[in-house]
């Protein structure tokens, strides 16, 4: 709850009264009509002063109607002056924009309009009218970059990981599967349950790596440890995991003790850049971690894995990639960077593979999983909706809205090929002898 001083409370109350009595300026109304005229559905906007207008395909009565309530004129003020649709997401998260109908209908609209277009002849009148509207009483801040911290430095990466993953293990348990696997599942058919699909993914990774009893397996960014425990219990390996999340470390230690795996499994709080610089592990896996590395650090990342792998070993890298070169400029990417994954960065698969080859890896296999992640995210979003009230009581209404929007938006991103995900199997170029089966089916048997 906000702790406002008496003077700030008076100012806030005055701002609220001014907002209630503020009319929608005529020029802004005309601009909205032009901007929204091509919508493929009927959109009703209910404004803060009880005014209500219909935009878009209003004559097509058979199309579903979506209703927006804009609770403060400062939303439109900020939208016009910044020309940034991220303002709409800010407003939704703060409860200043409420939606009745299908939330998904708005996400593609925002995604395909990365900038609000204002024609030169409109701009002067719009900006003047926007300035006359009351300001929002607050601004939503992104995760700040502390003085002296550089993007993808060790300290900054640790802070970014903890910003996302240290929301509490109970939070993630509300909507993930029982093993708390926070990465793409593998569905043998669309009706497969999330729990079964996650177990199938874990086992598929173990088979791709050709795990054998007694081998050592390193998991870079091991999360809550489901893959390591699966490999230890089903394939007889000795597991070693690293994470930068304190919450994940605590959970892993609890599970290791509960399942009596202390002599076969170790998890530590460690940066991948501090891995042993000599061959230590028979097999290495990294699932959903490369997105946090940063493109400029790809050589360091692939080199760290290469140095830690024993001769004849395999490295499976599972990560999200971009379908095109956006440079982090799309609305979806900026939203995720600002609120969800600070400093997350996606490259095209070709960039990732090129760096891997230049670092000294041979590419053995590339497996596309985009439809699997779309299905995974649909399961997560559905679970989250069912647990929304519990999440809101834990983290607050704003964060609950934030994560709900994030999961739906990501599902749409994979369904519409804005984002992709691949599993890449690698081995050192110095391993000249082919010690793998000749056919793909042979590896997976």
Kindly label every feature range from the protein language model:
Residues 260-272:
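Conserved SAM-binding strand-loop segment of SAM-dependent methyltransferases
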Residues 320-434, 440-444:
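Substrate-binding/catalytic lobe of Class I Rossmann-like enzymes that use SAM or dcSAM, i.e.
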Residues 299-311:
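A short glycine-rich, Lys/Arg-flanked "PGG" loop and its adjoining helix->strand segment in the class I
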Residues 224-235:
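Conserved SAM-binding loop of SAM-dependent methyltransferases across substrates and taxa
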Residues 273-284:
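A short acidic, Gly/Pro-enriched loop at the edge of an enzyme's catalytic core
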Residues 213-221:
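Conserved class I S-adenosyl-L-methionine
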Residues 1-192, 196-198, 204, 233:
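Feature captures hydrophobic
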Residues 312-320:
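Conserved beta-strand signature within the Rossmann-like core of class I S-adenosyl-L-methionine
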